[in-house]
């Protein structure tokens, strides 16, 4: 399975779904929730099922509507897709309740409320999820907090810490600066620096910036650096102007071990 750094939200409308076929994102999140009005829910579910039945797409996730979850997953049961994104996760009780519906699907828990953040350790430790994702827009709306990288730093660091502690991937909130690509790219770089495994996006033009920001963490690049370091007799390696020492190589080896373990499952 390909490494996922960039995840593009795609509303489940027919014309939007077709764009998945030419997208450069590592994964796609077909949205049946926030971007879809209540009147469109049934039509969009029909369109999503039709798309999945007629196209082979790797790394497609479905963001379900919690109120319609059982109906949606029942109808999607025979379709091929990698997993689901569960919105507004606030505790493990809901995940327990829906465990049967999640069977054989990768689950991304979207944490986007004050209650969810307050229970982040128990959510991160839940064995049935593969990843955590942060939804800043809902969180800041609920707390009347300004959405800025500086103000959200402690919350994001907490999410990353607990995700890593329990072996889960962690994906950062999407940037809404679709008219300021430079700023969005800077936010993606900040996400990578904080230790996130990737970042979500709401527009295709932000995907290149996300891919570039996380390029330093691509497996092949890491493997190349480790091999070069071990083939020399120096304590320091310089690649493309960047200095790597023993502690960097130890970290890269951990990443490679994790990647190999996941690939063999």
Range-by-range predicted roles:
Residues 1-265:
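Expand to "…catalyze enediolate/carbanion chemistry for C-C bond making/breaking, isomerization
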């Amino acid at each position: 399975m390909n490494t996922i750094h960039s995840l593009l939200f795609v509303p489940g409308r027919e014309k939007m779904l077709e764009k998945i076929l030419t997208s450069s994102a590592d994964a796609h999140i077909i949205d049946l929730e926030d971007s879809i009005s209540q009147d469109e829910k049934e039509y969009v579910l029909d369109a999503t099922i039709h798309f999945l039945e007629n196209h082979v797409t790797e790394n497609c996730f479905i963001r379900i509507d919690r109120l319609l979850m059982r109906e949606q997953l029942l109808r999607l049961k025979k379709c091929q897709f990698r997993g689901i994104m569960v919105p507004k996760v606030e505790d493990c009780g809901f995940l327990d309740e829906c465990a049967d519906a999640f069977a054989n699907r990768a689950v991304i828990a979207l944490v986007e409320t004050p209650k969810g953040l307050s229970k982040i350790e128990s959510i991160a430790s839940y064995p049935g999820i593969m990843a955590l994702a942060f939804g800043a827009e809902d969180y800041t709306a609920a707390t009347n907090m300004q959405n800025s990288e500086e103000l959200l730093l402690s919350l994001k660091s907490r999410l990353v810490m607990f995700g890593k502690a329990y072996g889960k991937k962690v994906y950062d909130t999407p940037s809404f600066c679709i008219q300021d690509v430079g700023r969005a790219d800077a936010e993606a770089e900040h996400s990578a620096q904080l230790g996130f495994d990737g970042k979500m996006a709401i527009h295709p033009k932000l995907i290149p910036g996300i891919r570039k920001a996380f390029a330093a963490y691509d497996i092949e690049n890491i493997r190349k650096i480790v091999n070069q370091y071990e083939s020399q007799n120096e304590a320091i390696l310089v690649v493309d102007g960047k200095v790597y020492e023993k502690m960097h190589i130890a970290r890269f080896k951990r990443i490679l071990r994790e990647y190999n373990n996941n690939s063999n499952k």
